[in-house]
């Protein structure tokens, strides 16, 4: 009954969610072989056509439901591993080897494709009709910033739990005691919600963060602690962006992407933009953020099920203002 009251029953099957973009892979993950992904409970295959463009379609061959991701590519066309049926651009079946010359290809032999784009070094899918273009990040076109991508991981936790965590700062002294949260003030000032720009809604705050040796490449400081001016905001349904500005003028922008595989597992990746001098190796820059993400994963995988969205038994306090507003907007969206 609680799930029904809170709009979370069958969360990933909610039709409105299908009309948004979700990250499923890095662009570099898709080269000379097809790959298999799962989005909102749907199994899909992605491959690169002859011209390098991406094609995404239902994973099962319409003939005998063989997994097409186990096939291979010939001149940008996907060949089924079972009977050799071949699919070209737009998922159109162009060859059935067992058919005699002149026999037409059945209309049902073609694959059902889904929308796919490549942006920010990531592969994004939309299962329905995209509501809006993908958000723009000004740092991407600013030559003073560099972009650093990280691998796409699979977490055993609902995407809703991940977003709730990424919008929260009160867990820092506890979950992140091993990285930047040690000794951090536990009391959080009253926050005000605002549009941070045209695409993200959230709040601004300042913290004094621990700056251990392994964080110094990220912070650009040798001090034991550093002042951070930060923002955290969401873009519906499941994207979070955090920005960090240091006194030196260094800016560190993190895009946190949670993609529902099913009700209880998700893809996760984060992307960083920085206006540093580009001399520090990317792996060194992101090592600290990876460690922070691992602390989150360990905690989140202890939580069960989809995050309740509506009026629930969950107790909220003033520091939860951003996550409460995100849940309110998300519930309104999925029930629209």
Each predicted region: which residue ranges?
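N-terminal flexible segment immediately upstream of the FAD-binding catalytic core
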Residues: 1-2, 17
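Rieske [2Fe-2S] iron-sulfur-binding domain
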Residues: 2-3, 9-10, 23-147
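Short Pro/Gly-enriched beta-strand edge/turn motifs at strand-loop
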Residues: 17-26, 92-100, 173-176, 237-241
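A short, structural micro-pattern
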Residues: 18, 110, 117-119, 252, ...
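Short beta-strand or tight-loop elements
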Residues: 20-22, 42, 112, 189, ...
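C-terminal catalytic domain of Rieske-type non-heme iron oxygenases
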Residues: 53, 131-336
